[in-house]
């Protein structure tokens, strides 16, 4: 018989840098999960990724206090900032533009995030990421 699910915990944790301090410790401690076991497993799974890149993770906690987790791809905004070498987006995206993103960069980010996004084709995923880029104050090349 399948294990009974007690809770789902959604977090964003830096790749290869999970430790028991907030936000990981309190979120998992409330559910009675072995925090160090999660940290070691998460760090092992994300060691191939760029250290410090925020990785969304969904942790499924079962009634017997065991857990499984699924890592997702980094948020589109983080990938856009990394691709353009920006520290942050614009505080006034409608007035101040902070950079320009090309169609090739959009396609690369859409392909990276393809597994975690809805949308039938890569073009629809590119449009979604272009919307994120515009909301950050980036100019999207046509």
UniProtKB/Swiss-Prot annotation:
Gene Ontology MF terms in the entry? large ribosomal subunit rRNA binding; structural constituent of ribosome
Matches recorded under Gene3D superfamilies: Ribosomal protein L11, C-terminal domain, Ribosomal protein L11/L12, N-terminal domain
Superkingdom classification of source:
Bacteria
Please name the GO terms of the biological process aspect recorded for this protein, alphabetically. translation
Q: How is it modified after translation?
A: One or more lysine residues are methylated.
Q: Which UniProt keywords apply?
A: Methylation, Ribonucleoprotein, Ribosomal protein, RNA-binding, rRNA-binding
| UniProt key word RNA-binding | yes
The terms describing its cellular component in GO are: cytosolic large ribosomal subunit
| InterPro entries, per database record | Ribosomal_uL11, Ribosomal_uL11_bac-typ, Ribosomal_uL11_C, Ribosomal_uL11_C_sf, Ribosomal_uL11_N, Ribosomal_uL11_N_sf
Q: Name one Pfam family in it.
A: Ribosomal_L11_N
The subunit structure is: Part of the ribosomal stalk of the 50S ribosomal subunit. Interacts with L10 and the large rRNA to form the base of the stalk. L10 forms an elongated spine to which L12 dimers bind in a sequential fashion forming a multimeric L10(L12)X complex.
Q: Give the function comment from the record.
A: Forms part of the ribosomal stalk which helps the ribosome interact with GTP-bound translation factors.
Instruction: Tell me its family.
Output: Belongs to the universal ribosomal protein uL11 family.
Please identify the protein, giving its name as recorded.
Answer: Large ribosomal subunit protein uL11
- State the taxonomy lineage: Bacteria, Pseudomonadati, Pseudomonadota, Gammaproteobacteria, Pasteurellales
């Amino acid at each position: 018989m399948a294990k009974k699910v007690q809770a789902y915990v959604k977090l964003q944790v830096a790749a290869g840098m999970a430790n028991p301090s907030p936000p990981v410790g309190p979120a998992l401690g409330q559910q009675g999960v072995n925090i160090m076991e999660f940290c070691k497993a998460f760090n092992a799974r994300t060691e191939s990724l760029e250290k410090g890149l925020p990785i969304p993770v969904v942790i499924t906690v079962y009634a017997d206090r065991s857990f499984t987790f699924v890592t997702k791809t980094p948020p589109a905004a983080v990938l856009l900032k990394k691709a353009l070498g920006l520290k942050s987006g614009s505080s006034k995206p409608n007035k101040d533009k902070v950079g320009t993103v090309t169609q090739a960069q959009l396609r690369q980010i859409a392909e990276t995030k393809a597994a975690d996004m809805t949308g039938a084709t890569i073009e629809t995923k590119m449009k979604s990421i272009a919307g994120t880029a515009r909301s950050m104050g980036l100019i999207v090349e046509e």
